[in-house]
């Protein structure tokens, strides 16, 4: 039984997280033949200020990105 952990920035909707869980489950079913009911997915939400990219907090990087 696979257990998949996804770390991602916090702030996504309940619906978006449900889509992530379904997509991962479907991918394992289609690619490895694992029954959907055997797959577990955990989403761990991390605030951007606790996430570093290239030595800089993601919240700082986002603040300096141009917005469309």
Where are these regions (language model features)?
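A domain-level signal for the structural core that forms small-molecule/cofactor-binding pockets
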Residues: 2-68
């Amino acid at each position: 039984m696979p257990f998949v952990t996804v770390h991602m920035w916090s702030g996504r909707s309940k619906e978006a997280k449900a889509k992530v869980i379904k997509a991962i489950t479907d991918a394992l079913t289609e690619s490895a033949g694992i029954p959907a009911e055997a797959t577990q997915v955990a989403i761990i939400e991390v605030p951007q200020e606790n996430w570093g990219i290239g030595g800089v907090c993601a919240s700082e990087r986002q603040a300096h990105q141009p917005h469309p």
